[in-house]
Amino acid sequence: MHYAPHVPTVLDRFIQQAVMQVLQKRWNPTFSQHSYGFRPQRSAHQAVAQAQRYIAQGYGWVIDLDLEKFFDRVNHDKLMGQIAKRVEDKRLLKLIRAFLNAGVMENGLVSPSVEGTPQGGPLSPLLSNLVLDELDRELECRGHRFVRYADDCNIYVRSERAGQRVMESISRFITQKLKLKVNEAKSAVARPQERKFLGFSFTAGPDIRRTIAPKSLERFKQRIREITRTAKGVSIKTIMEELALYMRGWRGYFGFCETPEVLVALTRWVRLRLRAALWRQWKTPRRRRAALVALGVSGELRNMAGSGRGPWHLARSKALSVGLSNAYFKSLGLPSLFDAR
């Protein structure tokens, strides 16, 4: 079977948005205080900060739950049963059922679906929160410290043994009661410092600080590599514009970390990438020398134009540090990941 995402049409989106606004106003106040995803005046940053507070209080083990293909596996009949408890209007129930039954594609033919929520639709996040509200209530009844952002749920306990016990019982609840599946390969009981939550992790020791998870750092670097790869005909202005757009957006989210030294090091790394990229772009010793002259590099330092060393090594050289200085890149619009956050 080939899965085709339930991508709504313009009219579908308009109607879903209208329905969502009405239902969200009614339902949102009833949702758990531990739920942060896709709710007014709530954010991923608030969820991460709450997780940090639990860890600081001595809950040094986390049950990191990953729900397997959550948006694909939501059972329609169960979901409609939950909606019917909150919505009396039969016409509205019929409309929501129609959105859910968008269908999947098999051998070129669309057949009705019995599982999943319409990904990309305005109504989908609200329906997902409704499904997982049952999980929130169960965790609250058991007295657990937990944080949920959409289908990302972390439960904090004081010991590994308690974590294993909770993992087993909650996984059983999710499977039997919610009719969803826990991805055992991606779920774990571990120290919070070993796991990623909404792109962040935490430092070890008595002073718990928010830091950027290794996978998030690697994704950032991979995107910078893609942007700064020298392509024929791509100007430094174009590269800078794309870099600035990406880096400002990234800083807006990950600037919430409490490890400024990481942001400073990343900014330095971006500049090195740019110096290496420009060195490659200049190609020949003659062009490199001319570029260094134009950048105001002094006579002795210009001699490295004929160096046979690699671009990444030369990116650290004094000549490129002077010619392609931090101030030079700033004048071209390159933002810092740390300054003016």
Language model region names:
Residues 1-341:
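Non-catalytic terminal/accessory segments
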